[in-house]
């Protein structure tokens, strides 16, 4: 498993490549500001998903054990990284409106559910499910 600092170094490169003025420009004036927000947020969230409170390292371990599936996209693989999610989808990508979410919660929450409702009713169960997978032989 990568140490936190090595993981963060790789993630900062990855997240910098995802910055788009069109998509993120409202809340982040440039790529460096976006990357700095990401670094501060991932540390504040202790490398855990905002919704299910599961460590990205536990999620990566489950992926490596083939207990969780990933999804290939045109820009990489969804699953082994925390993703930038808008708490209120109708609002833009701003520091106040964004959190880091695992792929599984982000995909599940989609644009349909309120972030706090999702966190309360689904996040806790997702965490229990991940714990179940960790203990499953």
Where are the predicted features?
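Short coil/turn linker and secondary-structure boundary residues
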Residues: 2, 29, 93, 112-113
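Short, charged surface segments at domain edges that flank catalytic/cofactor-binding sites
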Residues: 2-54, 59
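Short, intrinsically disordered terminal segments enriched in charged and Pro/Gly residues
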Residues: 6, 15, 123-137
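Charge-dense, low-complexity polyampholytic segments
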Residues: 49, 121-124
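Histidine-centered nuclease catalytic patch
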Residues: 54-98, 109
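Short Cys/His-centered divalent metal-binding micro-motifs
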Residues: 57, 98-120
């Amino acid at each position: 498993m990568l140490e936190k600092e090595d993981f963060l170094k790789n993630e900062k490169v990855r997240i910098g490549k995802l910055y788009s003025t069109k998509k993120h420009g409202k809340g982040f004036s440039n790529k460096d500001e976006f990357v700095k927000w990401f670094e501060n947020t991932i540390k504040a969230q202790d490398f855990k998903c905002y919704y299910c409170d599961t460590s990205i390292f536990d999620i990566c371990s489950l992926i490596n054990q083939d207990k969780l599936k990933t999804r290939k996209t045109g820009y990489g693989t969804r699953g082994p990284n925390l993703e930038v999610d808008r708490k209120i989808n109708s609002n833009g990508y701003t520091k106040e409106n964004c959190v880091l979410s695992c792929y599984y919660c982000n995909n599940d929450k989609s644009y349909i559910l309120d972030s706090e409702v999702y966190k309360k009713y689904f996040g806790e169960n997702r965490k229990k499910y991940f714990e179940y997978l960790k203990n499953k032989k």
